[in-house]
Structures are given as C-alpha cells and as structure tokens.
UniProtKB/Swiss-Prot annotation:
One of its GO terms (biological process) is tRNA modification. Its cofactor is Mg(2+). It comes from Haemophilus influenzae (strain PittEE). It comes from the Bacteria. NCBIfam families: miaA. ATP binds at residues 10-17. Catalyzes the transfer of a dimethylallyl group onto the adenine at position 37 in tRNAs that read codons beginning with uridine, leading to the formation of N6-(dimethylallyl)adenosine (i(6)A). GO terms for molecular function: ATP binding; tRNA dimethylallyltransferase activity. The record marks 101, 123 as: Interaction with substrate tRNA. It holds the Pfam family IPPT. Keywords: ATP-binding, Magnesium, Nucleotide-binding, Transferase, tRNA processing. Belongs to the IPP transferase family. This is tRNA dimethylallyltransferase.
Length: 311
C-alpha cells in the first residue's frame, strides 16, 4: 500500500498558508512548500513568505534553499520533494504539499523525462548568434522548431530561449516533445485540494491589498538590496518573479512608482489567472475549498481525508 500525501493548491493570495497552519494543528502532517519563489533566500516580502511566527507553528521545507543567483528546475524540485516526503513518511507522518507552482505538482505526479545536461559549446554558439542577430531572432527560430515552447517563452528571455534551442540541438527533439515523455510516476496516493475565493473579484481585491501591504513592509528596500549586489539581472528566474521584475524595472528607471505598483498588481492577477486555468484543467480529481469559509475548508479536508483513509 502506498503512503498518503496531501496537496493543497490554489492561486496566489488564496489563503493556503493559513489553512496549512490550521491543518497542522489537527493532523500528523509536515509541510513542504511547492513554490518557485519561496526557494530563494533574501526574498521574503515580495514572495509573501510565511512569517517567523507562522513557520514556528508550521515549519515549511524547501524554502530559503537557494541564493537568488541560482536556478532551480521542476526536476530539482521533484528530487528534493521526494526526499523530504520519504523523510516525513519515515517519521509516521503525512507530507502536506502547499503552494501554487502547478508545474512542480505536475512534475511530481507524472514524473519527468530526463533532459540533457548543458553543453557549453552549443550554449556559446547560441550566445554568439544572439549577439549578432538578437534574441528575438533566436525566438523566431525556436517558434519554427517548437511552437509550444516559443509561445510560453518571452522573446527577451534569453536564458529559456537558449535552453530550449540547446535541448533541440543536443537531442534532435523539441523541449515540448521531451517533457511530454512520462517519467517515473509518484509513489504515493495523493488527495488534492484547491482553495480560492468563489468570487474572482475577491481574489483581485486581496491581491491589490497584499501588494500595497508589501510596499508598506519594505518591499522596495528588499529589492534594492538585491539590485545593488551587482551579480543579479532581470533574466534570472528569481528576479523574474512576479513583483520583483516590476520593482527591478522601477529601480532601473523604466517607469515611475505608481506605474510600478499598477504593473505589479496586474502581473500578480495574471499569475492567479494562470494558476486557476491550470487547476480547472487538472487531470486528476480536486476537492475545491472556499477561501472565505476557512473553518469549513478545514473541516472539509479533515472529513475528506478521513473517508479516503478508511477506503
């Protein structure tokens, strides 16, 4: 019999952390973060990282594990999450995976086909080509080889364009083809919940309020520390995180403070929309919870898990 794990998914600002803390007080669970922004050290305010008080109530694994100069893939996450899940189940507890990075959940459930390691010669050739023609030209080349990846990748995102082309030149297969080849399935039975307000306008309001609160808490100062380090740039995954990108561009002088706030809120709302789109198209059953009914949401999880474990 496979061990059980719980997935608590949902868009940004939906109340996942609060519910996770409530669940930990009632269930033998340990929390694993499923968030591609919370992995970075020194990025606390703009990622809405759980506070010290919240982490004391519900410690989260896989947060603060990387410097913002480093990259992290879905495959890295899968390896790390499986290790942490094994450790938790060995203690007789249930892994509770909490977060909104849907690609990480997908990688965990379905597995990933191994992608080739970086080839420095090919990367150098692509860099040289980009220096002559521009990354937009390489993005056009990618669109002919792998239209699905090209549609997901911004024409100015040099790192991801380079990687997608590199994979094709090494393997002769597109990144889309390779990622669709299934890897090893998840060795757990999983129960899935998604929390969100039933009214989309409530989520939009929460996102706007939270962004303004981040500004009050010192978000600009947090990004200024990263900006003045000198070794970070806007093409890094960390700085491309929602909110950080807009604040970075503001610090560069690309637009004024008011425009930065407007763009940051819009980008966060777009992220939430993408997360909800993922969830609505999810292939395996999800139990939906209402953010505005936290006690009812907790009781639903407890009841659902109890009936699931009884078979």
């Amino acid at each position: 019999m496979k061990p059980t794990t719980i997935f608590l998914m949902g868009p940004t600002a939906s109340g996942k952390t609060d519910l996770a803390i409530q669940l930990r007080s009632s269930l033998p669970v340990e929390v694993i973060s499923v968030d591609s922004a919370l992995i970075y050290k020194g990025m606390d305010i703009g990622t809405a990282k759980p506070s010290k008080e919240e982490l004391a109530l519900a410690p989260h694994r896989l947060i603060d594990i990387l410097d913002p100069s480093e990259s992290y893939s879905a495959m890295n996450f899968r390896d790390d999450a499986l290790r942490e899940m094994a450790d938790i189940t060995a203690q007789g507890k249930i892994p509770l995976l909490v977060g909104g990075t849907m690609l990480y959940y997908k990688a965990l459930i379905e597995g990933l086909s191994p992608l080739p390691s970086a080839d420095e010669n090919i990367r150098a050739e692509l860099e040289q080509k980009a220096a002559q023609q521009g990354w937009a030209a390489l993005h056009t080349e990618l669109a002919k080889i792998d239209p699905m990846s090209a549609a997901r990748i911004n024409p100015s995102d040099s790192q991801r364009i380079n990687r997608a082309l590199e994979v094709f030149y090494i393997t002769g297969k597109s990144l889309t083809e390779l990622t669709e080849e299934k890897g090893e399935a998840l060795p757990y039975d999983f129960v899935q919940f998604a929390i969100a307000p039933q009214d989309r306008h409530v989520l939009h309001e929460r996102i706007e309020q939270r962004f303004h609160k981040m500004i009050e808490l010192g978000f600009q100062e947090e990004v200024e520390k990263l900006y003045t380090r000198g070794d970070l740039n806007i093409n890094l995954p960390s700085i491309r995180c929602v909110g950080y990108r807009q604040m970075w561009e503001y610090l560069q002088g690309d637009y004024d403070h008011e425009e930065m706030i407007f763009r940051g809120i819009c980008a966060t709302r777009q992220l939430a929309k993408r997360q909800l789109t993922w969830l609505r198209g999810w292939k395996t059953p999800i139990q939906w919870l209402d953010s505005l009914q936290p006690q009812q949401a907790k009781e639903t999880v407890l009841r659902h898990l109890d009936s699931y474990q009884k078979g």
